[in-house]
Regions:
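Conserved kinase catalytic-core helix
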Residues: 80-115
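The N-lobe alphaC helix and its flanking beta3-alphaC-beta4 segment of protein kinase-like domains
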Residues: 35-50
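Short beta-strand micro-motifs within the conserved protein kinase catalytic domain, predominantly
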Residues: 56-67
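An alpha-helical support segment within catalytic cores of ATP-dependent transferases
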Residues: 106-153, 158-164
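Conserved small/polar residues in nucleotide/adenosyl-binding loops
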Residues: 176-178
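ATP-binding glycine-rich loop module of kinase domains
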Residues: 11-37
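Conserved short submotifs of the Hanks-type protein kinase catalytic core
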Residues: 65-77
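Pre-DFG segment of protein kinase catalytic domains
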Residues: 169-172
Length: 178
């Protein structure tokens, strides 16, 4: 695997993402937890099983002492880029986007972590909120229906790749829950 500076797609504070032949390689900083990298690979593998069009996991490896996740490269433009460059068709793009979101929510994956559990942990960690407010939020959260439908967690037009044939691929799956 040859990772070159000119093949960088995006650089974040905790990772650098490369285009490498027919793959995308996310190389995480040395301090990024190994368990988080394997968890992202596991989440992606579980979503593969739902039948959604996503970049499939190719492997997890060490690259120069840093953990890396290799996934399929999906050719196309982000829906965000298409919306920005073709404003006259924004309504069609929004309809396609909503249809894709409904397709995602129509999938189940019972082995993924629960979004309600994540939100409860986050609410409990908000020490700036008084106990009564936290309790009210937790009560409202608990009253929400229980299910195992997939929730992307960061679904926005920049996380949808539209291929030349119009096929939409969902990317950036690290925040997916049920």
């Amino acid at each position: 695997m040859k990772l070159e500076e000119n093949n960088i797609i995006v650089k974040r504070s905790y990772k650098t993402v490369y285009k490498c032949d027919d793959s995308i390689v996310k190389v995480f900083n040395e301090e990024h937890p190994k368990s988080d990298v394997f968890n992202e690979a596991l989440i992606t593998a579980r979503i593969e099983e739902t039948g959604l069009d996503i970049p499939k996991v190719k492997g997890v490896s060490l690259v120069e002492g840093k953990w890396a996740l290799e996934i399929e490269y999906k050719d196309g433009k982000t829906m965000e880029d298409m919306m920005n460059s073709d404003k006259k068709n924004i309504e069609k793009y929004m309809e396609d986007f909503v249809d894709l979101q409904l397709q995602i929510h129509g999938k189940t994956s019972p082995l993924l972590k629960g979004m309600k559990d994540k939100l409860a942990r986050q609410i409990n960690s908000l020490k700036d909120l008084d106990a009564t407010t936290r309790y009210e939020l937790l009560t409202r959260l608990e009253s929400m229906p229980k299910h195992n439908k997939v929730c992307h967690g960061d679904f926005n037009p920049s996380n949808v790749i539209v291929g030349k044939n119009g096929k939409m691929t969902v990317v950036d799956l690290s925040l997916i829950h049920i």
